[in-house]
UniProtKB/Swiss-Prot annotation:
The keyword Iron-sulfur does not apply. Pfam families: TIM (PF00121). Its main location: cytoplasm. GO terms for biological process: gluconeogenesis; glyceraldehyde-3-phosphate biosynthetic process; glycerol catabolic process; glycolytic process. Pathway: Carbohydrate biosynthesis; gluconeogenesis; Carbohydrate degradation; glycolysis; D-glyceraldehyde 3-phosphate from glycerone phosphate: step 1/1. This is Triosephosphate isomerase. One of its GO terms (molecular function) is triose-phosphate isomerase activity.
């Protein structure tokens, strides 16, 4: 099974619409063939319209950084997956450790969001990852496997084949620390084996698994050389056109 690599920028709470348009203008003609690498930017909700308009006709896919699990209703401040689909968005990040930590999102919330995202014809990027304390206690596999089982509960094999799982050890996000390529591969392999146990070998071979946590041009090639790492979820290094282009064109 040949899985198309996917490099996704997660802009977090950075960039305004003007900066977004300038960024896309700088990268849109230099992106790799989408059959070789899928190039994705996940932007704040206030930038999505500018991103969509600027990226029109290019190889750049567009993602949101979060959504709610209801399409509409009295949910002040939330983002509708239905409206994201109507806007032409492709992916939605859910379960990021910053959402789990700062906004107290639970595994149940993330599972509901995954179902709502699929119900609206979008694709989730489901984040998982352990704290430094969990790793030092050598309980990282149990922790991440538990997150995966909870997030995928009730999803079909076909749905799981079409989603992306992003392994982001919390201790490596924005810290400059990176899991070694062997540590990252070990956990991504465990995630794939978990999908196989929950579904079947075909589903496990189809699902794409990213590594996230201080991914940058200097380490992307080594990470992407590992058999179970299919992409990167990139924070700070995705904010500058030059470094983003180095990341998505890592095969050159």
């Amino acid at each position: 099974m040949s899985r198309t690599p996917i490099i996704a920028g997660n802009w977090k709470l950075h960039m305004n619409p003007e900066q977004t348009a300038e960024f896309v203008d700088a990268v849109k003609d230099k992106l790799p063939d989408p059959s070789k690498v899928e190039s994705l930017i996940c932007a704040p909700a206030v930038d999505l319209d500018a991103l969509r308009k600027a990226a029109k006709g290019s190889n750049l896919h567009i993602g949101a950084e979060n959504c709610y699990f209801e399409d509409e209703g009295a949910y002040t401040g939330e983002t509708s997956p239905k409206v994201l689909k109507e806007m032409g968005i492709d992916y939605v990040i859910i379960g990021h450790s910053e959402r789990r930590g700062y906004f107290h999102e639970t595994d149940e919330d993330i599972n509901k969001k995954a179902k709502a995202i699929f119900a609206n014809g979008l694709k989730p990027i489901i984040c998982c990852g352990e704290s430094l304390e969990t790793r030092e206690a050598n309980k990282q596999e149990d922790w991440v496997v538990g997150q995966i089982k909870a997030a995928l509960d009730g999803l079909t094999a076909e749905q799981v084949s079409n989603l992306v799982i992003a392994y982001e050890p919390i201790w490596a996000i924005g810290t400059g620390k990176t899991a070694s390529s062997d540590q990252a591969e070990e956990m991504c392999k465990t995630i794939r084996e978990t999908v196989k146990d929950l579904y079947n070998e075909e589903t496990a071979e189809n699902v794409r698994i990213q590594y996230g946590g201080s991914v940058k041009p200097a380490n992307v090639k080594e990470l992407m050389s590992k058999p179970d790492i299919d992409g990167g979820l990139v924070g700070g290094a995705s904010l500058k056109p030059e470094s983003y282009l180095e990341l998505v064109n890592y095969q050159d």
